[in-house]
């Protein structure tokens, strides 16, 4: 086998086990989290697995392009984790090709350059202030590149299947709800009237129920009765909903920490990997 193939087969079971353990250690919370903290709880279990992959990538990069031997037991151990990875990637690709989101009354589409799309029938059913409130909410999604973040979150959740899928799914739902509440608050901060936005949310929910018997995952979360009530009550409360915006400093701190972790582990694999990683292949 090539060195990079051996590295991948060795990394898969170790990274997979660490991902499952980390996912089971991070508890899901039903609500009350800020969006940025809910996001951190969702993607944090990926850090140990990513570090392992970086370690083996450094080792593969450092070595010569020559055939490597690998014990049969290593291949057998890698198979179930390879199947989980293949399933997660297949579901991620399918979500990109799915047309379920196209039935949404209002949506933000595009992973790289998100754009706001409003269904014509939905727009006609709203007053001008209500339509502006909807556009303001969707523009908040576009500013934060939420379609890409939702896609990454769904992939991260699927990678925890099947041993830690329930906890990962609960964290995904908690983050998706916190995301909508944060974008509602951002729309109000940009001048949207809470009553107009609440009315538009109810109209959108009615349209989803009537025209999308099999809604997308995001639409199903948005249409959940208990969460819909929570959104409306927050908007119509005497005090405007105040969901703190994500801290740019905190976000960049997380990114820098992850980049440092991956850089350090890659360097360790690059410099010292030949001393101990080949022992795993015997």
Predicted segments with their positions:
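Basic, amphipathic juxtamembrane/active-site segments
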Residues: 149-158
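Short, surface-exposed, polar/charged, turn-prone segments marking secondary-structure boundaries
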Residues: 144-146, 162-163, 263
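Polar-ligand-bearing catalytic/cofactor-coordination segments
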Residues: 26-36, 73-150, 167-245
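Hydrophobic or amphipathic, alpha-helical segments that drive membrane association/targeting
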Residues: 1-103, 245-282
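Short glycine/proline- and charge-enriched loop/turn segments
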Residues: 159-167
């Amino acid at each position: 086998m090539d060195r990079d193939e051996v590295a991948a087969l060795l990394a898969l079971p170790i990274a997979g086990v660490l991902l499952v353990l980390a996912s089971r250690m991070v508890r899901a919370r039903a609500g009350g989290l800020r969006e940025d903290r809910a996001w951190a709880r969702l993607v944090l279990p990926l850090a140990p697995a990513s570090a392992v992959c970086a370690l083996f990538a450094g080792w593969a990069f450092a070595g010569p392009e020559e055939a490597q031997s690998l014990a049969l037991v290593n291949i057998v151990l890698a198979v179930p984790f390879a199947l989980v990875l293949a399933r997660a990637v297949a579901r991620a690709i399918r979500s990109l090709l799915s047309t379920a989101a196209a039935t949404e009354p209002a949506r933000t589409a595009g992973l790289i350059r998100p754009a706001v799309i409003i269904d014509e029938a939905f727009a006609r059913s709203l007053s001008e202030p209500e339509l502006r409130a909807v556009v303001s909410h969707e523009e908040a999604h576009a500013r934060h590149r939420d379609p890409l973040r939702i896609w990454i979150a769904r992939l991260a959740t699927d990678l925890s299947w099947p041993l830690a899928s329930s906890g990962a799914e609960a964290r995904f739902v908690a983050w998706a709800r916190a995301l909508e509440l944060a974008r509602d608050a951002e729309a109000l901060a940009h001048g949207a009237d809470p009553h107009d936005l609440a009315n538009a949310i109810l109209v959108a929910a009615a349209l989803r129920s009537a025209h999308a018997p099999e809604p997308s995952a995001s639409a199903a979360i948005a249409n959940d009765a208990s969460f819909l009530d929570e959104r409306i009550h927050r908007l119509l409360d005497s005090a405007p909903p105040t969901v703190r915006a994500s801290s740019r400093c905190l976000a960049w701190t997380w990114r820098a920490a992850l980049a440092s972790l991956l850089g350090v582990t890659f360097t360790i694999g690059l410099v010292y990997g030949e001393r101990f990683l080949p022992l795993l292949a015997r």
